[in-house]
């Protein structure tokens, strides 16, 4: 019998707030977290807006002596993991420790640290480089620091698959539990790349929105006037547990993770395939893995980046995958409010998808003022929708054509 995997905790940090409740309330209100960049002087950049995390104090989660040893993306990962662990009411005991693992992803890692230390090198030579530079910046140290924090000695890894990274981390974690390698996984992703090089690099690709005078309206998935994505930052972490383990300890269960799909476009380094093939196959793979029919899906948290190509091709892929049901399923892009968290997007959006099941509420797609004729499905525009959600899909598509889909279901004994 296949071991079942359930979600017992959700930890979220995004431009909408620090903590799961703050994020959920903002999502339900249809509030934008996008504003003018404050972290550096972006006056010379074509894109001068982003979704920065506000009011985050690392000292609430991390000892002062350790903060300087970590890039902000690691700090976000620790804080989101703490929120998730607290919600799960989980303590990793010495007996549990070898069976508890961590899988935290990032698309870019410690960009701010890399830029700072490069400046130190140029200005002062190699002796100015911090001894904490490497462990503060490399991607797997988010998982490493979280495992140290909670004493998790089981499987420990990190994915770096662009915007699909944390969805892969969550799906791979579920597979580890299913095959008996772990009973508990702390899984998700974290990102903090709103830096001169980060913004400048994406802007050079002409991937970013330049609606600088109306930041809160810049991220507008599926809208005719969309002009690129808006960078965001933060973290999304889930606590995954084997069902019987969770039941024995009396855990509250948010939802069950029943399906996981992976695919590649094998088409282009940044653009999705023109026929939506990779997206179709990844959704079909998640449905098949779950043993669920397309008509069973009540909600899709779309990748929905607000770029000209992604949104129309994701729409096409949903139509191909879901057939007649495509027009009946509720779809929303919460990136309209959070911006694009890059490697952390899948973790944040998996958490949002789980909360939609838990609360029976579908967050809206804001700024959908003039729907693109090629994007003609139900994107839950402007306002939340109260609706029972039994099965929901979360899509994540990344540069290099790497795709992931997670399928969650309301827990039923």
Q: Which role does the model predict for each range below?
A:
Residues 7, 23, 28-162, 190-199, ...:
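Conserved beta-ketoacyl condensing-enzyme motif
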């Amino acid at each position: 019998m296949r071991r079942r995997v359930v979600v017992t905790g959700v930890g979220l940090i995004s431009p909408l707030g620090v903590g799961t409740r703050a994020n959920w309330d903002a999502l339900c209100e249809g509030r934008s977290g996008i504003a003018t960049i404050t972290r550096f002087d972006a006056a010379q950049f074509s894109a001068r807006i982003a979704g920065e995390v506000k009011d985050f104090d690392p000292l609430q989660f991390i000892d002062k002596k350790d903060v300087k040893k970590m890039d902000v993306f690691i700090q976000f990962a620790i804080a989101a993991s703490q929120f998730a662990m607290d919600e799960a009411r989980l303590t990793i005991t010495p007996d549990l420790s070898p069976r508890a693992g961590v899988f935290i992803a990032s698309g870019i890692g410690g960009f701010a640290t890399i830029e700072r230390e490069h400046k130190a090198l140029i200005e002062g030579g190699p002796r100015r480089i911090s001894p904490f530079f490497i462990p503060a910046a490399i991607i797997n140290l988010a998982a490493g620091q979280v495992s140290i924090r909670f004493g998790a000695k089981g499987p420990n890894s990190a994915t770096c698959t662009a915007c699909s990274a944390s969805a892969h981390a969550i799906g791979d974690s579920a597979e580890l539990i299913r095959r008996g390698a772990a009973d508990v996984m702390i899984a998700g992703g974290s990102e903090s790349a709103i830096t001169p090089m980060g913004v400048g690099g994406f802007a050079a690709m002409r991937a970013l929105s330049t609606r600088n005078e109306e930041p809160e309206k810049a991220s507008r998935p599926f809208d005719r006037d969309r002009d690129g994505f808006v960078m965001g930052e933060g973290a999304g972490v889930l606590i995954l547990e084997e069902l019987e383990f969770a039941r024995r300890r009396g855990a509250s269960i948010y939802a069950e993770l029943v399906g996981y799909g992976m695919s590649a476009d094998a088409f282009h380094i940044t653009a999705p395939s023109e026929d939506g093939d990779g997206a179709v196959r990844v959704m079909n793979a998640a449905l098949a893995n779950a043993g669920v029919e397309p008509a069973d899906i009540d909600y899709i948290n779309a990748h929905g980046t607000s770029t000209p190509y992604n949104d129309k091709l994701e729409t096409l892929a949903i139509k191909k995958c879901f057939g007649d049901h495509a027009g009946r399923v509720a779809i929303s892009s919460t990136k309209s409010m959070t911006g694009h968290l890059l490697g952390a997007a899948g973790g944040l959006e998996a958490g949002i998808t789980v909360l939609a099941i838990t609360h029976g509420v579908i967050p809206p797609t804001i700024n959908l003022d003039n729907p693109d004729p090629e994007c003609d499905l139900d994107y839950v525009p402007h306002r939340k929708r109260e609706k029972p959600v039994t099965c929901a899909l979360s899509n994540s598509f990344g540069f290099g054509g790497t795709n992931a889909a997670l399928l969650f279901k309301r827990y039923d004994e």
